[in-house]
Amino acid sequence: MAKKGKKYVEAAKLVDRAKAYDVAEAVALTKKTNTAKFDATVEVAFRLGVDPRKNDQQIRGAVVLPNGTGKTQRVLVFAKGEKAKEAEAAGADYVGDSDYIAKIQQGWFEFDVIVATPDMMGEVGKIGRVLGPKGLMPNPKTGTVTFEVEKAIGEIKAGKVEYRVDKAGNIHVPIGKVSFEDEKLVENFTTMYDTILKAKPAAAKGVYVKNVAVTSTMGPGVKVDASTFNVK
């Protein structure tokens, strides 16, 4: 395990690891214990009581956070004809078809999200082995395989985040930056928590949300007592 820096060690002393904090207090403490010199990302981590090995306990989706994430997403759209024009008008950073597939095959990745119309998925599938490991493959569950390209682009630019349970039953999602006002981070947290609750698989047994923590890019995790706020 890598040795923690002096600033991290000092920051970690401010967090009681045995305590679950009120969400507002957890957010404030996360900002206070941030050790990065840049505008670090604030992330929420969920440990869930699901078995991701089972198909009926997979959790994946997307949600638009009310206050965005603080990051400008570069959107690549695979579309043709009128849908390509619609994507350009909606503010997509890149729009094309086989030309961009060729660029990606050559190692180009100057984008954050891909949106593709369903009729383009046959072509996009050719680079699935490249996109998949990077988490960039478009998927209907996250609204990135759609003919409603204007809506998809608008949501992504407004702060849409994707979430997916990993092999260990955890979900990590960015909810903003340390420069955000506390209230905005709390609102984003609440939206994300509500979304995860609604995504509970019917096959999941026992305690669903086992643990929730908030952390910054280079700061210690702060455990959250989810009972201290009202979920919508």
From Swiss-Prot:
InterPro entries: Ribosom_uL1_bac-type (IPR005878), Ribosomal_uL1 (IPR002143), Ribosomal_uL1-like (IPR023674), Ribosomal_uL1/biogenesis (IPR028364), Ribosomal_uL1_3-a/b-sand (IPR016095), Ribosomal_uL1_CS (IPR023673). Signal peptide: none annotated. It holds the Pfam family Ribosomal_L1. One of its GO terms (biological process) is translation. One of its GO terms (molecular function) is tRNA binding. Keywords: Repressor, Ribonucleoprotein, Ribosomal protein, RNA-binding, rRNA-binding, Translation regulation, tRNA-binding. GO terms for cellular component: large ribosomal subunit. Part of the 50S ribosomal subunit. Belongs to the universal ribosomal protein uL1 family. Binds directly to 23S rRNA. The L1 stalk is quite mobile in the ribosome, and is involved in E site tRNA release. Protein L1 is also a translational repressor protein, it controls the translation of the L11 operon by binding to its mRNA. This is Large ribosomal subunit protein uL1.
